[in-house]
């Protein structure tokens, strides 16, 4: 057991039992006493002199140590916690990040926004702030107006925009103003954007095809939905599906690709039509949005497992369909990793200048099966 006394310095990050005792002792006294600098020091596992240096900024303190002090101060309600936070931020470079998403009411993009906000709150090494806006449609104009409208208010811009010459030209104009742009999920503006951050979409398509071929009990037909021809990522996923079946499962026939505009109603109607016209339909892959429509159609017309359905992104709808086995697998973007990496790369671009060589920053997808949720 850890003895608690006025001068105890216990690192709660590495000794949870000690932390529990400290917090128990603190709560027993918090009604009678305001938290003091000694309480902060004990919970943070540092000396009172270190807390004093963080508070008053007299001497430099390592960022990790200052963060421990700040976390401890917030945790126990120390009155000067906001001041400690300001001290920590004072000498850090500024990063104002603009984020342009779409489909505001979709669960996935709400989760995206929440993870981006969390990453900004937890960012170290920069004074990060975030502005998030949502495009009302897939129109290139909607994206370009929102992106260029952020000029002068942000230091870097990241977007899930469509692939279109107008978007590319907007990125060129933003670059000329010294604002680096990052393509998220869909690799738009290749050759002029700073980085692409997302999944390797060709591999994603091959993963989907592999699962469908494995789950299907008999040879037959395969359907692929894409959101539209302006989504480069969807086209790469479609290519991955076709290349896998061509190489490893030629007994399956991949039908002509269907456009669903990422809407559930179009996907629902098209899926019911496919099931009616192709009794030997063995698998469906939704390369973009609209998966809710395919799930609803299969629930109406097929028993679980009769048609292998692979979709993207774990949402309440796809999780539920995994549980009842109308979805065979979900291929998900690791949003926490994406947002953390975005902040790191954006900070590097803002402090180091726009790179002459653009890169792709691939993330490992998260794969979910019925037994893993």
Describe these PLM feature segments.
Residues 80-145:
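Amphipathic helical "hinge" segments at domain boundaries
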Residues 102-108, 131-142, 163, 186, ...:
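Hinge/beta->alpha junction and helix N-cap segments in small-molecule ligand-binding domains
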Residues 245, 334-373:
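Hinge/cleft segment of the Venus flytrap/periplasmic-binding protein
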Residues 16-85:
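N-terminal helix-turn-helix DNA-binding module of bacterial transcription factors
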Residues 204-222:
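A conserved helix-loop-strand patch within extracytoplasmic ligand-binding domains
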Residues 1-30, 300:
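Short, intrinsically disordered or compositionally biased N-terminal tails of bacterial proteins
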Residues 156-175, 241, 256-317:
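Hydrophobic alpha-helical
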Residues 166-203, 315-323:
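Flexible loop/hinge segments that line or gate small-molecule binding clefts
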């Amino acid at each position: 057991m850890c003895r608690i006394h006025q001068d105890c310095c216990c690192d709660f990050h590495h000794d949870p039992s000690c932390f529990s005792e400290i917090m128990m002792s603190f709560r027993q006294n918090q009604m009678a006493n305001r938290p003091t600098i000694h309480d902060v020091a004990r919970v943070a596992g540092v000396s009172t002199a270190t807390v004093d240096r963080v508070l008053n900024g007299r001497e430099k303190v390592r960022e990790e140590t200052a963060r421990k002090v700040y976390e401890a101060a917030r945790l126990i309600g120390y009155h000067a916690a906001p001041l400690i936070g300001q001290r920590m931020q004072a000498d850090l470079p500024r990063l104002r990040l603009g984020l342009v998403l779409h489909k505001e009411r979709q669960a996935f993009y709400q989760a995206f926004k929440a993870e981006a906000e969390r990453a900004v709150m937890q960012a170290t090494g920069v004074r990060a702030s975030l502005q998030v806006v949502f495009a009302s449609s897939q129109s290139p104009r909607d994206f370009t107006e929102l992106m260029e409208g952020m000029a002068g208010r942000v230091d870097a811009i990241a977007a899930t925009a469509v692939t279109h010459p107008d978007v590319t030209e907007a990125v060129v104009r933003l670059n000329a103003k010294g604002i680096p742009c990052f393509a998220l999920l869909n690799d738009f503006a290749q050759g002029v954007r700073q980085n692409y951050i997302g999944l390797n979409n060709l591999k994603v398509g091959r993963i989907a095809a592999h699962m469908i071929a494995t789950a299907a009990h008999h040879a037959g037909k395969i359907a692929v939905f894409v959101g539209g021809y302006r989504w480069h990522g969807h086209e790469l996923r479609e290519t991955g599906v076709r290349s896998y079946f061509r190489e490893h499962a030629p007994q399956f026939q991949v039908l002509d690709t269907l456009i669903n505009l990422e809407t559930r109603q179009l996907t629902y109607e098209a899926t019911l039509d496919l099931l009616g016209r192709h009794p030997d339909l063995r698998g469906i892959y939704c390369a973009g949005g609209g998966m809710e429509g395919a799930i609803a159609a299969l629930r109406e017309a097929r028993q679980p497992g009769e048609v292998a359905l692979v979709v993207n992104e774990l949402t309440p709808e796809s999780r539920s369909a995994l549980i009842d086995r109308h979805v065979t697998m979900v291929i998900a973007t690791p949003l926490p990793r994406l947002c953390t990496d975005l902040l790191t790369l954006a900070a590097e671009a803002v402090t180091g200048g726009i790179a002459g060589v653009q890169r792709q920053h691939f993330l490992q997808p998260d794969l979910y099966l019925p037994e893993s949720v």
